[in-house]
Amino acid sequence: MLVNNVGMLYDYPEEFLDVAGGYQKIRDLISVNITSMNAMTRLCLPQMVSRGCGAVINIGSLAGVSPAPLVTAYAATKTYVEKFSTTLHQEYARKGITIQCVHPGFVKSNMSQYLIPDELPGFLAPEADKFVRSCMARFGISTVTAGYWAHDLLWVLPPLILPESVRKSQAFDVMSLAREKALNALKQ
């Protein structure tokens, strides 16, 4: 089994033209989030094909399927993860290989420390080990999943009950608060 759990984010949420590190930071983000996933898959897939079985889990993000202002390039790379995973699954499922894309919401980690709103209920941001157990229990059920029940709700319910303009506005507010939180932490 190959798990492509790669992720690089900006130092803090920021408008695209103002990202610290400029275009080089964006290039690095693309290299880590997309190029390394492709390279590892190309490295491991031949052995899976020769054995006639295998599994690849590619970690995307809810940012790749939901409004994600102030992390534009990151969100775009995570959208790529889904397209790569679903089309690769179509190519290799008949050869016994399952390829799945997981789009988690907030999971407690070093990378997400500034992004998780303080008022967010704990069940919406599980510890990494709890998320992994949930994700593995769902492996092979669908090609694309959020991996965790509460993240399923965050993915499915908002488009059903809120207009897109409201979801975009809320996402901007959440990411603006995350930006503020990160900048305040950097000042200390």
Regions found by a protein language model. Give the residues of each.
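Conserved mid-core segment of classical short-chain dehydrogenase/reductases
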Residues: 9-27, 70
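SDR active-site lid
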Residues: 89-170
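A short helix-coil junction within the Rossmann-fold of NAD(P)-dependent oxidoreductases
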Residues: 9-13, 43-52
